[in-house]
Amino acid sequence: MPKMKTKKSAAKRFVVRPGGTVKRGQAFKRHILTKKTTKNKRHLRGSTAVHDSDLNSVRAMLPFA
């Protein structure tokens, strides 16, 4: 059986909390911000949790987290 490895691209994007939930950053906040409203940009601040349907995929990419 080959060695298990962490997907480094996923390790840079996700943080696993002690309770088991996975934290991720918000999308749509990098560029083309002039046409987005201030309210929209404000709501994109901070981080949010990964959706339940994506949790298994993210956890498979982070076997040691």
From Swiss-Prot:
Molecular function via GO: structural constituent of ribosome
Example of a GO biological process term: translation
Q: Which UniProt keywords apply?
A: Ribonucleoprotein, Ribosomal protein
Which GO cellular component terms, listed alphabetically, does the Swiss-Prot or TrEMBL entry include? cytosolic large ribosomal subunit
The entry sums up its family as follows: Belongs to the bacterial ribosomal protein bL35 family.
Name the UniProt record assigns to this protein:
Large ribosomal subunit protein bL35
**Source organism:** Paraburkholderia xenovorans (strain LB400)
